[in-house]
């Protein structure tokens, strides 16, 4: 008899995929021994003749179901018109600790923008009663201590996910446009008796996009001060995909300009800003602290190595099982595990969400949906200077060999 781990190596699939096959009864003679399974030595890997065509999924999938949110990052729309995987307990985990400034680093297409928009909708005070978008979600079951924060803060929200240009001039113009749009969301400040004429003059500069580069670099700091004065409540600042323009600067030769701007931009917003309730940033990379976060001692970094928030970006095994059940294709679980169950965030095994929703939406045809969803210039540069030892380890990984790395992470 062999273990699931031994069979996984022989069949070249994940241990969880083998376990799932055992649970579903697809491996004749497999028996459970305590918490593990024992598999006959002569067992062969179950074959699904429908894998290549996806015909089973197309015929068997229930059609009277909400569509999956491919490319949808609007929380209100996602949770009302599409199949939504409830990630609202991220709010509880945050409120239990209340770090002043949080940075979440995750791979691209892992739901960062959708989660940040969820935070915006939850916390932002508006004329609309936005509690209706959370009353059937997990966060609402957590009690009044958490509900008391709903709709109680002014919010500044920016996403840099589309700031992808070949020059510094085009980049700064796009950032100026984003600030113009965000200031436009807060035009109530222009009629506020608590805002000085000087501040309103600056506000109109940003609104008309006539401010210079230096003035623009302090726009977050100044807007947070005006919102705090008007509402008697310091705002929450959310910056999504903060590192996108920095990556572009690295690959397009304007790195010094973007780093210099971002250092002042973020320093004014997050460093010793008394007009800040909380701050959230998301990105793919951890840019060196001395580059743009110099002196920002209140920054809490949450990477793929950390247990905190490990289940809120990407799909967990339970969430994938529920999704497959909803669409009536539970038989596809082992195949989906084999293809897309490839991440360990903290202590949580995580599926690539972009691949999962595309796989189900496109008739359960397995393929590399995540390929070519972003740029890899930085990785390419790292590989060019990689040592022979690193190259050897990479070859081992490509051959399915498990390797051990000892490393330290620095900001």
Regions found by a protein language model. Give the residues of each.
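A short, Lys/Arg-enriched interface patch at domain edges and termini
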Residues: 41-60
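Phosphate-binding site recognition
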Residues: 61-411
């Amino acid at each position: 008899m062999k273990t699931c781990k031994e069979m996984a190596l022989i069949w070249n699939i994940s241990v969880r995929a083998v376990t799932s096959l055992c649970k579903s009864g697809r491996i004749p003679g497999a028996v459970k021994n305590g918490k593990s399974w024992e598999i006959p030595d002569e067992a062969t890997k179950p074959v699904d003749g429908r894998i290549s065509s996806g015909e089973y999924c197309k015929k068997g999938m229930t059609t009277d179901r909400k569509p999956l949110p491919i490319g949808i990052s609007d929380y209100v729309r996602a949770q009302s018109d599409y199949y939504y995987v409830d990630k609202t307990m991220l709010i509880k985990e945050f409120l239990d600790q209340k770090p002043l400034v949080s940075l979440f680093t995750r791979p691209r297409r892992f739901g960062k923008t959708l989660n940040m928009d969820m935070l915006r909708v939850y916390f932002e005070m508006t004329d609309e009663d936005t509690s209706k978008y959370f009353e059937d979600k997990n966060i609402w079951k957590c009690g009044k201590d958490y509900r008391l924060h709903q709709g109680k803060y002014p919010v500044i929200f920016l996403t840099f996910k589309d700031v992808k240009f070949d020059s510094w001039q085009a980049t700064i113009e796009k950032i100026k446009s984003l600030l113009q749009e965000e200031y436009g969301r807060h035009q109530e400040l222009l009629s506020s008796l608590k805002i000085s004429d000087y501040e309103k003059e600056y506000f109109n500069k940003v609104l008309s996009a006539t401010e210079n580069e230096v003035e623009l670099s302090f726009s977050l700091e100044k807007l947070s001060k005006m919102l705090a004065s008007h509402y008697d409540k310091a705002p929450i600042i959310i910056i999504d995909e903060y590192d996108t323009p920095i990556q572009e600067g690295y690959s397009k030769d304007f790195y010094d300009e973007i780093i210099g701007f971002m250092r002042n931009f973020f320093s004014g917003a997050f460093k010793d800003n008394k007009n800040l309730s909380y701050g959230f940033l998301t990105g793919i990379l951890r840019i060196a602290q001395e580059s743009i976060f110099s002196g920002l001692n209140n920054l809490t970094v949450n990477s793929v190595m950390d247990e905190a928030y490990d289940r809120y970006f990407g799909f967990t095994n339970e969430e994938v099982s529920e999704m497959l059940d909803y669409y009536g294709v539970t038989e596809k679980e082992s195949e989906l595990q084999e293809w897309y169950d490839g991440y360990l965030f903290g202590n949580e095994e995580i599926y690539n969400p972009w691949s999962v929703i595309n796989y189900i939406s496109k008739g359960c045809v397995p393929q590399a949906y995540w390929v070519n969803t972003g740029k890899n210039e930085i990785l390419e540069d790292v590989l060019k200077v990689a040592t022979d030892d690193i190259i050897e380890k990479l070859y081992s990984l490509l051959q399915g060999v498990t390797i051990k790395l000892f490393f330290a992470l620095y900001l």
